[in-house]
Amino acid sequence: MYVLSVEKPTLRNKFAAGIGVVLVCVVASFIPTPVFALDTTKLIQAVQSEESALHARVGMTVFDSNTGTTWNYRGDERFPLNSTHKTFSCAALLAKVDGKSLSLGQSVSISKEMLVTYSPITEKSLSPETVTFGKICQAAVSYSDNTAANVVFDAIGGATGFNAYMRSIGDEETQLDRKEPELNEGTPGDVRDTTTPNAMVNSLRKILLGDALSASSRSQLTQWMLDDQVAGALLRASLPSDWKIADKTGAGGYGSRSIVAVIWPPSKQPLVVGIYITQTKASMQASNQAIARIGVVLKDTVAP
């Protein structure tokens, strides 16, 4: 149910591997398997404890940039995407910006008829006012504004455009089928609007730490996630003030609660984390507290 794997070498380290081939041949038998920089025993105990307490299904994946290893619990099981899709929807929009087919400065008009539930930013910027795509993505990612997310959805070509973008970065699992708020239904067994923790962590790693986006677009998306205004009760509640976190949360039917994040511990390479909870009758506050407690274990088990 839980897995520890080692990432394959990238192009950037192949050269170093090549020039050291003779040395490797001599001492290979003395080189240990890369060690995960986290105490996976404590992690699995923490996740299973919260899963039991919530009477829920919990999935979690962690990628450790320090060692190139990935750990997961239920990492290949499907969970509702909920609002975690907003980071990836805006990544798809930024890819269009990189391709010169759209500009963050381009303006759109939002009518009253377009408003859906939980739109704290866009409800204040209705037609005849116009709003730039930059502000729209900021609203969607930093404030989880649902109408803003739907505007992005349309701009990237709807579900077809979203899914095509995810496939273009190697994500064969994540799928978006509906707009806000319908996508948050979360009915068990329904594959619509679902993902896996493994897919989310791998895709977020490529987008924020890799080269799926240009440097400027990557920086912009990271900033929107650093400025997340609705995630204070989750992993942020567990981390010291000198740890940076860029995150996006989600919530939906059947007790679904989720978060994807890149975390920068001081003087270390980042961790990429995805936690998904569903099929529980527990309150959102209880799920928030569960994620925060998992975050405490994550923090405490980072290798010194």
UniProtKB/Swiss-Prot annotation:
It holds the Pfam family Beta-lactamase2. One of its GO terms (biological process) is response to antibiotic. Substrate binds at K248, T249, G250. Residues 173-195 are annotated as: Disordered. Its EC number is 3.5.2.6. One of its GO terms (molecular function) is beta-lactamase activity. The keyword NAD does not apply. Residues 1-37 form the signal peptide. Keywords: Antibiotic resistance, Disulfide bond, Hydrolase, Signal, Transposable element. It catalyses: a beta-lactam + H2O = a substituted beta-amino acid. It comes from the Bacteria. SUPFAM superfamilies: beta-lactamase/transpeptidase-like (SSF56601). Disulfide bonds join C90-C137. The active site is at S83. The class A beta-lactamase family has a specific amino-acid numbering system, sometimes called Ambler or ABL numbering and often misspelt as Amber. A multiple sequence alignment was used to derive a consensus sequence and then the consensus was numbered taking into account insertions and deletions. This allows use of identical numbers, e.g. for active site residues, despite differences in protein length. UniProt always uses natural numbering of residues, hence there appear to be differences in numbering between this entry and some papers. Belongs to the class-A beta-lactamase family. Hydrolyzes carbenicillin. Methicillin and oxacillin are weakly hydrolyzed. This is Beta-lactamase AER-1. The gene is aer1.
